Design a protein with these regions (language model features):
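Amphipathic alpha-helical assembly/interaction segments
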Residues: 1-106
């Protein structure tokens, strides 16, 4: 196992980054009326996941690390909710929905 030297070596960051790229691709196809609504909210939310993982990695104390990793988990949960809404309003089809790296979603 390789030594973790950077936040980019963390599995959580790598998976989160894949999600960011997926969400940006998906939201590129949303209706323009969602530019300042769901599109903006989803993008901010997934960027928050990887940003909090990165910031948590740089923190010195375990307490601080846990705080930022917990915020990343909260943002992930929020993004799961947004993906369910996106599916339910018809902005994404089930096939595309199932291909997302959100294995916890049904």
């Amino acid at each position: 196992m390789e030594k973790i030297k950077s936040f980019t070596d963390l599995i959580a960051w790598k998976e989160g980054h894949k999600l960011v790229l997926n969400i940006y691709e998906i939201t590129n196809h949303f209706p323009s009326k969602e530019t300042f609504g769901l599109t903006s909210q989803m993008r901010r939310c997934v960027v928050s996941i990887t940003s909090n993982v990165a910031e948590g990695f740089s923190r010195r104390t375990t307490k601080d690390k846990i705080q930022f990793y917990t915020m990343a988990q909260r943002s992930l949960t929020e993004s799961q909710n947004q993906l369910l809404i996106t599916r339910d309003v018809g902005y994404i089809k089930m096939k595309g929905f199932k291909n997302l790296p959100h294995r916890q979603l049904s």
